[in-house]
């Protein structure tokens, strides 16, 4: 077998010399990992003997792991490679410059500027101006006339500056997004055993020979072989396309592959392949090679099928066969289909993007119409004036001069469009989001999808988990019911009969994940550290409080000796472990929710430690007198029980039979204190108009008590607290289908959903989002930590995954990761989201004022004076101010607490409120009045020569310089006004906290002074006197005074004002719209979202361009995810075989018949899961039962959530 790309294998002599020290080579391990199931078992047995022998050859211990010696680790990296997939090579700066030059508007400006430049050197024969009319400068100004080329050159220079600024911006943005991705990579760690210690190691540092601890919810970071496992089931659909979960056992299928998800159980594996040598890495390498070949073919203009490349890959080595499920179709047709499929089904845009798209299209249309009218009127004016009124003949020698005039008109028209179209919007969005994302990291929010940031600003509802989010996730047993006695404090060991104490200790120590541990405190006098499942840590702490050593018990009964483990899942809602008794027979330890466990018990231990009957009446009394009082104090109640099998070995698949007739040992009450900062955070949410709902698996009384402590419920409230069963009864019809009408009667009053499953959470979230009751449709945020929370996290407008307690599966489904698992971080995300929304609105208010004034001035000037008072280069400068600098200044305003004192904007509230419209029109009136006054009377007011109707190549005039200077200074001071959009009087509030804003305003003012005083002919400016400067400055400051006048006018009194920028319920872009350009969509995403701001949109195809900008920006961060480590590689949608299916399932509503079938499948799945084979991999073999399972991404699919 050959390596698909030569650089993949360490080929240097050092690596080769080290390779001999290990009992197997890199190629041996790669060949082994290509095998599956029985083939793999046979190969291991024939060539290595056993998995333990492989560990011996790799010089690692199955129990202790590697020693962690740096020299040994480096040797392994040399021989077997690093656990890293090389990122795609970034584009060079010159490539980015070339990309920026492709913009249609810039090309038009370049061509027009070049024509203007060439024609400016032409003079009509005879040297008399009258030949072609009064279109060139007077004879005495011939020297000045010789410099007519400067305007064309200045436009070219402006284009070059724009191109370089664009390229630099693109480069810096890509660098920033790569930095964000590397931060996400660093956050990804995996449990590795080194030197006998379980440590969390960054994924990139894993080497071949490491012993990895695998648990449910993990995304496997490398290939490996199972050493020991408990009920381990893997979702391999990302590699094989198989939706059914694969059970992994030592004797049937021990091969674990990178990029696959652990859906159930736990175990240990020895790492055998990492990085580009793992199965995922090999696929990545092959696909990358094909992409390069395709790119080369495109460059050469060849039109050959990609199937040829794939066939070559298959003949190169057998590894290519592993990726067949990813490419089931062949030939040209399949490639076309795959390209379309990779774009996925209709993508729903975020609320802000939808509103911006509609607004930008409207503005773009208006700008296009105005620019066309401007050019037509200028041409008509010129033609009528010269050839009709003055009756001149069109002379051949004057044609270049006329063309030069037409080019000038055309340039004016293009510059009107440059100013009119809001190409600064993408930059404002990008800067605001990038700034917010960077700052949100400090507030413990790791944003994975940029648009989730602004969506949080619209959130109207938050469905939060309880454990770890609202509470501290530090479990402590504070009460217990043992042997008929309710202990309000932890009992002393002497108070308990010896046999009862032994049963409590053994049941807790053995029947819990061996990864759950209590470690010494990091600081002297601190609390012991809890590692692993926090509920189990609380129980182990109870054992420690009873003065017992749980490690000693586990040493006597190591994990390898456990006969069988029934891991926790949402169907069982309990965990059980089977062990062999020394005297023969079996003992089953079981723990779970107290009500569920008590129903399975028919006997109980008494005070003396004897076993007595436990009748229904006794159970009811226990619930009433023990469990409910514990729950009302906010304690989680866990039941512990056991059962002995002394006779014939039972059928371990029949769980219903095994888990009946249990003996109740104890019921414990576990306290998980509410985080001290949570009540205040929930009060902030209430004040901000956000409803907080708690969704938990706990007892309804426990949930109600915690909700009251948090402030979700207050005494006297008329709100609902429901259990999952009651919730489903209320919302489903006789057929078991969810009815939206019924759900709409429940969710507005629902505040607590207890004893809920992940399916219930998904149903609730979907129901709230799909509901149409009320003025505004709901925007829902959801928190989740379990594998099963994936569907709800995907369905929610914003999904929050827990960074500490969350599984990899939950994190991959989320939009934002809470690095501290704290609810207050969600409130901070709301604040940042609203700040993004306000930043965009501030920028819009500013930009639309400039748009309205500049377009009307250019249009009116063209119609009346046959010239625009603002020249092309000046317009480009104004555009640079209002686009680049203004977006930088207004999009980086820090958030304030005042953002949380108003209600959410909602989905349908317009971007431009009536107050903003008042501000826009009010300031436009002031600016237009001043500009027109200066244009038509400025020469008299300042006693200077008029600049109106100047000849074609005349020198700059003081008159029009004052117009330009005043116009820019008015925009500068209006930028300060634009800091407030809700009618606030003090526009300077907090301005000194925003250093960027102050720097931009002062920097722009300084540049304006240089342009006027030094810019000269290229900027059509001439020097101004100090008095003229003072007047310009005074008029500019007048903007601030005028702003106070506008804010004093009540908005309600202006009935004629309309709102703008409304959002529809669901903004969608169809596949047809996506396919308008044949350029690779993934390549366009980063380019469009980041480049369009400076170089301008395509003014000819404004509508299409603007729609595509905001659509592609939704996924801009995905382009930046150059896979640094293998851990995140398989999360990329283009490599997920079932992506389209899963997305369509989540995004489209089910038809009643489909929903019914899904539920039938779910019931079958649940029923058969209970009876399936759960034998521990180290125990006796049993018959395997086929499971009828729904799709892994289905909302109805049930996986596990911790107790």
From Swiss-Prot:
Tissue: Ubiquitously expressed. Not detected in liver. The highest levels are found in uterus and stomach. Isoform XA is found in uterus, brain, stomach, small intestine, colon and pancreas. Isoform XB is found in uterus, skeletal muscle, lung, kidney, spleen, stomach, small intestine and pancreas. Isoform ZA is found in testis and isoform ZB is found in testis and heart.
Biological source species: Rattus norvegicus
Cystine residue pairs: none
GO BP terms: calcium ion export; calcium ion transmembrane transport; calcium ion transport; cellular response to acetylcholine; cellular response to epinephrine stimulus; flagellated sperm motility; hippocampus development; intracellular calcium ion homeostasis
Keyword Transport: yes
Keyword terms of this UniProt record: ATP-binding, Calcium, Calcium transport, Calmodulin-binding, Cell membrane, Cell projection, Cilium, Flagellum, Ion transport, Magnesium, Membrane, Metal-binding, Nucleotide-binding, Phosphoprotein, Translocase, Transmembrane, Transmembrane helix, Transport
GO CC field: basolateral plasma membrane; ciliary basal body; glutamatergic synapse; intracellular membrane-bounded organelle; membrane; membrane raft; mitochondrion; plasma membrane
Location within or outside the cell: Cell membrane; Cell projection, Cilium, Flagellum membrane
Membrane topology: Multi-pass membrane protein
Gene3D superfamilies: Calcium-transporting ATPase, cytoplasmic domain N (3.40.1110.10), Calcium-transporting ATPase, cytoplasmic transduction domain A (2.70.150.10), Calcium-transporting ATPase, transmembrane domain (1.20.1110.10), HAD superfamily/HAD-like (3.40.50.1000)
Basic and acidic residues: bias regions: 334-349
Residue ranges, Cytoplasmic side: 1-92, 172-356, 428-840, 892-911, 975-993, 1048-1203
Name under which the protein is recorded: Plasma membrane calcium-transporting ATPase 4
Main location class: membrane
């Amino acid at each position: 077998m050959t390596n698909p790309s030569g650089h993949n294998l360490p080929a240097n002599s050092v690596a080769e010399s080290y390779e001999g020290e290990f009992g197997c080579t890199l190629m041996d391990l790669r060949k082994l990992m290509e095998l599956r199931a029985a083939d793999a078992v046979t190969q291991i047995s024939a060539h290595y003997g056993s998995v333990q022998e492989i560990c011996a050859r790799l010089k690692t211990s199955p129990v202790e792991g590697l020693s962690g010696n740096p020299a040994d680790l480096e040797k392994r990296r040399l021989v077997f490679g690093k656990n890293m997939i090389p990122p795609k090579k970034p584009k060079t700066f010159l490539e980015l410059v070339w990309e920026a030059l492709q913009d249609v508007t810039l090309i038009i400006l370049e061509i027009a500027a070049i024509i203007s430049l060439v024609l400016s050197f032409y003079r009509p024969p005879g040297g008399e101006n009258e030949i072609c009319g009064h279109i060139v400068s007077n004879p005495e100004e011939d020297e000045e006339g010789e410099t007519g080329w400067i305007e064309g050159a200045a436009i070219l220079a402006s284009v070059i500056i724009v191109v370089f600024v664009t390229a630099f911006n693109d480069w810096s943005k890509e660098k920033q997004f790569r930095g964000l991705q590397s931060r996400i990579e660093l956050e990804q760690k995996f449990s590795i055993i080194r030197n006998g210690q379980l440590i969390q190691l960054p994924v990139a540092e894993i080497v071949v020979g490491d012993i990895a601890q695998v648990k449910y919810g993990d995304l496997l970071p490398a290939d490996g072989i199972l050493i020991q496992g408990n009920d381990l089931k893997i979702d391999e659909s990302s590699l094989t396309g198989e939706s059914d979960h694969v059970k992994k056992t030592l004797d049937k299928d021990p091969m674990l592959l990178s990029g696959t998800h652990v859906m159930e159980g736990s175990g240990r594996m020895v790492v055998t392949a990492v990085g580009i040598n793992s199965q995922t890495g090999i696929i990545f390498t092959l696909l990358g090679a094909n992409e390069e070949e395709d790119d080369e073919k495109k460059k050469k203009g060849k039109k050959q099928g990609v199937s040829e490349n794939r066939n070559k890959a298959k003949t190169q080595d057998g590894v290519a066969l592993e990726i067949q499920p990813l490419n089931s179709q062949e030939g040209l047709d399949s490639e076309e289909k795959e390209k379309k499929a990779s774009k996925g089904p209709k993508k729903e845009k975020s609320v802000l993007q939808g509103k911006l798209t509609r607004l930008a299209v409207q503005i773009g249309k208006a700008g296009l119409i105005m620019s066309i009218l401007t050019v037509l009127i200028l041409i008509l004016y010129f033609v009528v004036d010269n050839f009709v009124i003055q009756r001149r003949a069109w002379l051949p020698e004057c044609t270049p001069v006329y063309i030069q005039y037409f080019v000038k008109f055309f340039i004016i028209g293009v510059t009107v469009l440059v100013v009119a179209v809001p190409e600064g919007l993408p930059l404002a969005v990008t800067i605001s989001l990038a700034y917010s994302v960077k700052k949100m990291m400090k507030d413990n929010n790791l944003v994975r999808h940029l648009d989730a940031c602004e969506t949080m600003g619209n959130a109207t509802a938050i469905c939060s988990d309880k454990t770890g989010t609202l509470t501290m996730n530090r479990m402590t047993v504070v009460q217990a019911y043992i042997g008929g006695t309710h202990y309000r404090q932890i009992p002393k060991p002497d108070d308990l009969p010896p046999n009862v104490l032994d049963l409590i200790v053994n049941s807790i120590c053995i029947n819990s994940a061996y990864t759950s541990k209590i470690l010494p405190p990091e600081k002297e006098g601190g609390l012991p550290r809890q590692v692993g499942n926090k509920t189990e840590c609380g129980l182990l702490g109870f054992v420690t409080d009873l003065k017992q050593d749980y490690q000693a018990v586990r040493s006597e009964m190591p994990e390898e000796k456990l006969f069988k483990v029934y891991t926790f899942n949402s169907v069982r809602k309990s965990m059980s472990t089977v062990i062999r008794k020394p005297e023969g027979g079996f003992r089953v330890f079981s723990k779970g929710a107290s009500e569920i466990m008590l129903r399975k018990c028919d006997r109980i231990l008494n005070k003396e430690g004897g076993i007595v009957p436990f009748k229904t009446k006794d159970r009811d009394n226990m619930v009433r007198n023990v469990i409910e009082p514990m729950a009302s104090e906010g304690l989680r109640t866990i039941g512990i029980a056991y059962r002995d099998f002394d006779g014939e070995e039972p059928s371990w698949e029949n769980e219903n039979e095994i888990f009946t007739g249990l003996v109740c040992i104890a019921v414990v009450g576990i306290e998980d204190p509410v985080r001290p900062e949570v009540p205040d955070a929930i009060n902030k949410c209430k004040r901000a108009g956000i409803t907080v709902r708690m969704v938990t698996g706990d007892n309804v009384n426990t949930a109600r008590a915690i909700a009251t402590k948090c402030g979700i419920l207050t005494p006297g409230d008329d709100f609902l607290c429901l259990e999952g069963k009651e919730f489903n009864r209320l919302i489903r019809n006789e057929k078991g289908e969810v009815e939206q009408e019924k759900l709409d009667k429940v969710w507005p009053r629902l505040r607590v959903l207890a004893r809920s499953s992940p399916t219930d959470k998904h149903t609730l979230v979907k129901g709230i989002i799909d509901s149409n009751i009320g003025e505004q449709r709901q925007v829902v945020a959801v928190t989740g930590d379990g594998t099963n929370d994936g569907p709800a996290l995907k369905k929610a407008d914003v999904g929050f995954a827990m960074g500490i307690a969350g599984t990899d599966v939950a994190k991959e489904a989320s939009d934002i990761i809470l690095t501290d698992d704290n609810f207050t971080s969600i409130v901070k995300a709301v604040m940042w989201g609203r700040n993004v929304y306000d930043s965009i609105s501030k920028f819009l208010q500013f930009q639309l004022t400039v748009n309205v004034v500049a377009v009307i001035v250019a249009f009116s000037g063209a119609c009346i004076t046959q010239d625009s008072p603002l020249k092309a280069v000046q317009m480009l400068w104004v555009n640079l101010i209002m686009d680049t600098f203004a977006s930088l200044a207004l999009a980086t305003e820090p958030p304030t607490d005042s953002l949380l004192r108003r209600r959410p904007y909602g989905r349908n509230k317009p971007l431009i409120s009536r107050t903003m419209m008042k501000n826009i029109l009010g300031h436009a009136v002031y600016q237009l009045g001043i500009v027109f006054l200066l244009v038509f009377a400025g020469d008299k007011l300042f006693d200077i020569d008029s600049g109106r109707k100047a000849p074609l190549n005349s020198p700059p005039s003081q008159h029009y310089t004052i117009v330009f200077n005043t116009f820019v200074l008015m925009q500068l001071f209006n930028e300060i006004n634009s800091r407030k959009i809700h009618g606030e009087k003090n526009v300077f509030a907090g301005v000194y906290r925003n250093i960027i804003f102050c720097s931009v305003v002062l920097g722009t003012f300084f540049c304006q002074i240089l342009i006027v005083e030094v810019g000269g002919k290229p900027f059509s400016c001439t020097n101004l006197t100090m008095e003229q400067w003072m007047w310009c400055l005074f008029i500019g400051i007048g903007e601030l005074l005028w702003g106070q006048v506008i804010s004093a006018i009540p908005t309600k009194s202006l009935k004629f004002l309309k709102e703008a920028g409304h959002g529809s319920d669901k903004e969608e872009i169809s596949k047809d719209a996506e396919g308008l350009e044949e350029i690779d969509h993934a390549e366009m995403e980063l380019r469009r979202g980041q480049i369009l701001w400076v170089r301008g949109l395509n003014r000819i195809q404004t509508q299409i361009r603007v729609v595509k900008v905001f659509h592609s920006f939704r996924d801009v961060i995905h382009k930046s995810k150059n896979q640094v480590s293998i851990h995140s590689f398989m999360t990329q949608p283009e490599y997920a075989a079932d992506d389209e299916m899963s997305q369509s399932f989540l995004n489209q509503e089910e038809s009643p018949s489909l929903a019914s079938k899904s539920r039938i499948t779910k019931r079958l799945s649940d029923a058969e899961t209970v009876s399936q084979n759960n034998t521990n991999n180290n125990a006796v073999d049993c018959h395997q039962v086929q499971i009828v399972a729904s799709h892994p991404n289905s909302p109805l699919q049930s996986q596990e959530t911790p107790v």
